[in-house]
């Protein structure tokens, strides 16, 4: 399997620089690693992982049934095949505001 050269921290720095450029960014959605690779090869600026599309791909309606593990695992599989920054829809944050201390570090490792 193809792994990328850039670590998540470098991808975040790159994305921050793109945001500061004040240019319109093109960020299509990817629901699997192959789509993410194609997005990078075509020349887009980043990859978006949709919570709704991910839920549907797992066989769930988009009503908050995916877990943090579902989202972090799928997002990791997608982000590891591209040097582009990956924006992940973490839906409702999984459970409550007090759960944020687990959600954010988990997703930031993606």
Q: Which functions belong to the PLM regions below?
A:
Residues 1-29, 38:
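N-terminal amphipathic alpha-helix/helix-capping segment at the start of soluble metabolic enzymes
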Residues 22-25, 44-45, 82-84:
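Short, well-ordered coil/turn segments that N-cap beta-strands
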Residues 32, 39, 89:
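Conserved, mostly hydrophobic/aromatic
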Residues 26-29, 47-49, 86-90:
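Hydrophobic faces of well-ordered beta-strands that scaffold small-molecule active sites
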Residues 38-47:
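Catalytic domains of carbohydrate-active enzymes, especially glycoside hydrolases
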Residues 62-88:
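Alpha-helix-loop-beta-strand connector modules within alpha/beta enzyme cores
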Residues 48-70, 92-96:
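Glycine-rich, proline-tolerant flexible connector loops at the mouths of alpha/beta enzymes
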Residues 100-106:
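Conserved small/polar residues in nucleotide/adenosyl-binding loops
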